[in-house]
Swiss-Prot record:
Keyword Endoplasmic reticulum (UniProt): yes
Protein name from the UniProt record: Uncharacterized transporter C36.03c
Predominant location: endoplasmic reticulum
Keyword Nucleus in record: no
CDD domains assigned to the protein according to its UniProt record, in alphabetical order: MFS_Tpo1_MDR_like (cd17323)
Record-linked InterPro entries: MFS, MFS_dom, MFS_trans_sf
Originating species: Schizosaccharomyces pombe (strain 972 / ATCC 24843) (Fission yeast)
Coiled-coil regions listed: none
Lineage: Eukaryota, Fungi, Dikarya, Ascomycota, Taphrinomycotina
Keyword terms, alphabetized: Endoplasmic reticulum, Membrane, Transmembrane, Transmembrane helix, Transport
Family, as annotated: Belongs to the major facilitator superfamily. CAR1 family.
Amino acid sequence: MYNNNSSTSSDSSNSEEKANAQHASSTDSTSEHTDPAVADEGFPAEQYQSADLEKQQLLIEEGPGGFPYITNPERFYVSLEPSDPRLAVNWPTHVKILHVALLAFTTLTASWGSSVFSAAATIFAAKYHIGLTVALLGMSLYVCGFASGPILWAPISELVGRKIPLIVGMFMFSIFSIAVAVAKDVQTVMICRFFSGFCASSPLSVVAAAFADMFDNKTRGPAVCIFACITFAGPLIGPIAGGFLAKSYLGWRWTEYITSFMGFFSTLCLLFMKECYSRTITEQEAARLRVEYNNNFIRAKSEEEYIDFKALAKRYLAVPFVLLFCEPIVFLLTLYMSFVYGILYLLLEAYPIIFAEKRHFSLGVDALPYIGLLVGVILGAALIAYFQGYYNRKLDANGGKPVPEARLPPMMIGSVLFPAGIFWLAWSGYYTHVHWIVPTLSGLLTGCGILTIFMQSLIYLIDAYLFRAASVIAANTIMRSLVAAGFPLFAVQMFHNMGIGWAGSLLGFIATALIPIPTLFFIFGKRIRLMSKNTVNL
């Protein structure tokens, strides 16, 4: 609605309607021309009818060059009440669920694309007579696209809303996926895989922010948990489908055709998505009112803000790295998340060694043990949901303000389960006489640890750096994506040269060394935050 601070704001906002009425008849007959919609928009009809036309005209003066300008623009600002049903946080539950499902599928498609190619890497390498490590660049370059994409998509989503970056990103993702499928040489595949990942980073950059738009402090945790589950489910499902596709008569190219079809379907669905960013919703309402009342002075205050591209570049390029290397909380949690995310993509190469090379599983079947990891991710989500009541009690006790440290208990449990799962996989996978179900079940602990560590770290950073969240998440996304891109490239050599047992143990020892991080912040986190000028004093 309009910003109604006084009755004069009502008078000024309808100056053009009054002028039209005055031109058609005398001032005494203005009541006959009163638009009932005026009262509906917060303008009482009595004030509209008794407006002083001469006073209204004084508000508009002639500026340089003869162009009119308004001396009191604040009277025409459009704002929405916090309880306005058009705001995403006030949408009905069924509408939110529909949007969560849509955004979840979009995220699944983007993350699926990162790993579906890995299942066909062996066939791709044989076809073009290249080494397996070179073939795996197709996956690593895609994840490198994840690292660079947020630099573009995150600021765009703050300028034009969430919907447009998602539609453009997923459409271009689909185009580049087709380009990979029809490529005639290795370099074309690699270049298009990078740009496919760059475009696929759109939902990874925007969906979490969209969930934050739709849900309050109490319900945001479960919503972001769904996002995290899908983010990890995609890379685990991709190799299963990709393996069976690659060995079928369809061939490896159909791993990309199917991916592009999923991308186009996501794009089509996103066309029906409602905008959820409050700034964009307000600007759209202002545009509607400008047309309805034929008054070009009506606008949202954000429309008058100067777009400072230098400030945007600083926010998403310079500030993230300043925070990363100057804030101990950001540095340690980003380090931990990067290692966990890297392990996820490393396991995409370790599992084929354990199950295909050592146990002689066929292509496609060798990816089925990823189901153990997938179930572990679901168990991690259940663990987080179990602690949601604990967090809500802390939230209520703090007057509704976020309590970052209350997010950490599930992560403390996951930090122990994670290395336990890695050690389990390493030594049960090393001995081939051990039944295949034993290393498969290790994924229950590993997957649970991966999700709880990643998820709770992410929300902790958002809660602690609320006003710097965009910059913190940008730094986090860039760093963990670069690490994840590098891990698969040395995984094969490490597991071949060191052996499955000791290669896995090395990773387990590193994971064990990182166990104290969540406990450290649970005890001293608030004290550390109080020493920083970038955190929120909660």
